[in-house]
Amino acid sequence: MKKLLSLPPNLVECFHDIEKADQTEWFCTSDPIGSKLGSGGGTAWLLEACCQKVAPDSDFLTWLGKEKRILLHAGGQSRRLPGYAPSGKILTPIPVFRWARGQRLSQNLLSLQLPLYEQIMEKAPSSLHTLIASGDVYIRAGQPLQTIPDADVVCYGLWVDPNLAKNHGVFVSSRATPDKLDFMLQKPSVEELGKLMQTHLFLMDIGIWLLSDRAVSLLVKRSYKEGKLSYYDMYSDFGLTLGEHPRTMDDELNKLSVAILPLPGGEFYHYGTSRELISSTLAVQNLVNDQREIMHKKVKPHPAMFVQNAEVGYQLTSQNSEIWIENSYVGAGWNIHHQTIITGVPANNWNLEVPSGVCIDVVPFGESGYVARPYGFNDTFKGALAKEETYYQGMSVGEWCAVRGISVEEIENGHDLQAARLFPVCSSVEELGAVMRWMVSEPALQQGKEIWQRCRKSVSYTHLRAHETRRHLV
């Protein structure tokens, strides 16, 4: 079964090498640089790119009907999970579950996601050739899958409380016909859901959609405007046209048949933010508390603490909560508190104070360079630098600059924090340590300031995602 992945640009060229993936089974591409296609337009782009690559002489609809396939959208901007933006969230390493057998130390989000999607497609009727899912979630089915009906669109959902559903898409069905979609809503209020519950049932959309060839062709058709592939969202645009009483009228799309299925024993874990990286991993680890089933005998100082492929000389204690250390060296001279993610740090002898809520990331650059890339646990990498509400490391960018004796104007591309040329490329681990100290906890450190001002800073969050070689990160 072919897998089609939409990935960050830097990951496309080396994905097959890194994952040891068969090129005949896995197809990878990225959205055109600078374009915003949305999940619908991105689906059209991914499918058409694959068709052109593997069957250039075939008609698109003919190619669609030849085999089943799984599409994973994993090329998002990762503004809220900066630590894994350069490498792609879908390859985020996930700790072995303490209660599970047969897992791999090298497992990642992709390897955990895929078995359920393959199981669904194997069970799906022959008319459903395409499954579309998101790359930043881990979804489990604790019970056997039910029969999948023959419809143009089949969507899976979860029974959830209205307070959780209000942040997601929602499938609304009549209590008389719970397996048929009445209409879809996007982020409805708790009050709206409360009124609907008198006559309707609702399931939270978990992003697993199966489409017939007819539905795919119409989705692709709607993704084009004036002959050009444009922004089209599969959920807020395409989804709202579906159901018995759709919220958006469209003569062709309104005629698509739709079935809604609750995922049996379903569990949904989102890995979209730094906080969710830890909270979702903790939730999965805590699925089993029966000590007879838990194979890991070592007790961590704090349950929300995850260390993988790392050498840690610093003594972690129960005071260190929401800690994630991966592929890094943390020496005895470090001081860590809580809400900290540490990734990619090379061997060092630094004395580094890491404030609560500050994360440390190092990205290799070129053959021997290092990019110092600290950020805040809750940073969203969004907004113009001059705006008071644009935060970096838990404070406004203006405040961060002021305490370090620099001006916001010194940072190029200040129209958006994601594009800002903020991160210095250092030539040695020693330079890296000094500039990191200045950027996170020692604003008066003149040596760090001089390195930051001297070093090449044409490196932004966007630049790293688009150009850094992923091979160096594994």
Model-derived segments and spans:
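Flexible loop/turn segments at secondary-structure boundaries
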Residues: N10-C14, Q77-L81, Y138-A141, P162-L164, ...
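Single conserved hydrophobic/aromatic residue that forms the stacking wall/gate
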Residues: H463, E468-V474
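Conserved core of the sugar-phosphate nucleotidyltransferase
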Residues: L64-K66, A85-G88, T92-S223
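A short glycine/serine-rich beta->alpha loop
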Residues: T29-L37, F97-W99
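Extended hydrophobic secondary-structure segments that form protein cores and membrane-embedded regions
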Residues: L4-L5, K68-A74, H129-D136, I260-L261
